[in-house]
Amino acid sequence: MKLHKKKLNITMTKQFIQKFPSNTVGSGGKTLLSKFQENSGLTETQIYILTQRVARLSSHLKNHNKDYSSQRGLRKLLGKRKRLLAYLSNEDVERYENLLIQLGIRGLKKI
């Protein structure tokens, strides 16, 4: 059961990455693409996929600014990405900072 679920998850990640090319996120798209296709369970991979979805949804909302369900979906995606970034910053600061640079996104606010 676990093996089937893992294969399905990897297949879905590959399909998502092919459907939404890496040119919408940051400058290191090609290297990120090959890295993230191998292991879809990595926190970095999940953040990368969420960043792709955020970019796509943001461009949709520029044209359809009254699409409130998409606005809600965007807020949910941003919250999930924020939680994953917080987890990664607590676990490994070096990986966290490298990911921020690769994806070209801002980090968490420091209090």
Curated annotation (Swiss-Prot):
Keywords: Chloroplast, Plastid, Ribonucleoprotein, Ribosomal protein. One of its GO terms (biological process) is translation. The keyword Ribosomal protein applies. It holds the Pfam family Ribosomal_S15. Gene3D superfamilies: S15/NS1, RNA-binding. This is Small ribosomal subunit protein uS15c. SMART domains: Ribosomal_S15. It comes from Staurastrum punctulatum.
